[in-house]
Amino acid sequence: MSEVVVKEQLEQYISKIERLEQEKADLLEEIKNIFQDASSHGFDVKAMKSILKLKKLDKDKLAEQDAMLELYRDTLGI
């Protein structure tokens, strides 16, 4: 592979990564704005973030986590 081809490939990779990093930053800013809007309408952002984490779990893992939490709460009387 010639140095010119290697340089062009490297520049393409770097360019793609930079573009994606900017898109990621834009998306994170948009998500932040959505949470701020939800908060201004009385929603609990911490609870919303917890729900988002739970939605990522598969059904079995979620059931297992719920059962363990219930066991611990019962054990501690809360």
Curated annotation (Swiss-Prot):
Q: Where are the transmembrane segments?
A: none
Coiled-coil stretches: none
* Matching InterPro entries: GapR-like (IPR018753), GapR-like_DNA-bd (IPR046367)
Q: Which GO terms describe its molecular function?
A: DNA binding
Pfam families in UniProt: GapR_DNA-bd
> Which family does the similarity line name?
Belongs to the UPF0335 family.
* Name of the molecule in the record: UPF0335 protein A1E_00570
In the record, what lineage is assigned to the organism producing the protein? Bacteria, Pseudomonadati, Pseudomonadota, Alphaproteobacteria, Rickettsiales
